[in-house]
A protein has these predicted regions:
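Substrate-binding cleft of extracellular glycoside hydrolase catalytic domains
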Residues: 53-80, 93, 99
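Short, composition-biased local secondary-structure segments
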Residues: 1, 18-22, 68-84
Length: 240
């Protein structure tokens, strides 16, 4: 484990089947901010090689086990993990879609070469100081305290700087989604209204929140600004 947890910020992103226009927007934002990000991949995309070759990006897997829970699956959990690992064979980090978790899933992650999992979301509002810890199967579990959609639903009003400066010596891991960065989502109604148009860029862009002070995109920029102003480092979760 490297770095000082009290002075390091970790940024992550779940692609969640975002269209290429939306993914491209996130890549442009990463270039603008010049910060390291781990992106958890859900699907094949023509942008995958561009993402893979980006010097600021590392790739993780984001398997979807929901069809298993809904009895709509034509494969088991091992196959789900195996298929997404074929797309991102180099991945050593994993976060399940919807944070679906079990000992069996963690053990399967490890068997596929995963060393770190990020399935534990404990919001900043809990007041709990987060630390990475070793699961008995051998994985390093890395809890995180911010997720853009959960932040919209919780409506706590806590600022980016409060997350960073009031979390003491604890982990500071943030998670975003390309669609919410694109829309600058400030409430889930905006996302739900835009959701039918995720593959129709000309319609989707009409749903963007243009307020530069409030929303997921604004929050990410504020995280980076506050971190730099207060001399925090930025690093990949793979370096924990």
């Amino acid at each position: 484990m490297t770095g000082d947890l009290s002075k390091t910020i970790y940024l992550t992103m779940d692609t969640d089947w975002a269209g290429d226009d939306v993914l491209s927007d996130s890549l442009t934002l990463i270039d603008e901010l010049q910060v390291p990000v781990t992106i958890f991949i859900t699907h094949e995309t023509k942008l995958l090689e561009t993402i893979r070759d980006h010097p600021l990006i590392r790739l993780g897997i984001h398997p979807n086990f929901y069809p298993l829970l809904q009895n709509h699956a034509d494969q088991d959990y091992l196959s789900v993990i195996g298929e997404i690992k074929k797309i991102v064979p180099e991945a050593v980090s994993a976060r399940s879609h919807g944070l679906i978790d079990s000992t069996a899933i963690l053990e399967a992650f490890k068997a596929q070469g995963i060393t770190r999992d990020l399935n534990l979301f404990i919001p900043f509002s809990s007041g709990i100081e987060l630390k990475p810890f070793r699961h008995f199967c051998g994985l390093l579990r890395i809890p995180y305290f911010y997720e853009d959609d959960a932040y919209c639903s919780e409506n706590s009003g806590k600022t980016a700087c409060e997350h960073i400066l009031s979390s003491g010596d604890g982990l500071k891991v943030f998670n975003f989604h390309p669609i919410h960065l694109f829309l600058n989502t400030e409430n889930m109604n905006r996302y739900l209204d835009a959701k039918p148009f995720q593959r129709e860029y000309s319609q989707l862009i009409k749903h963007v929140n243009r307020n530069q002070q409030i929303g997921a995109r604004a929050f990410l920029k504020q995280v980076v600004e506050c971190g730099r102003e207060n001399y925090f480092a930025f690093d990949h979760v793979e370096n924990l």
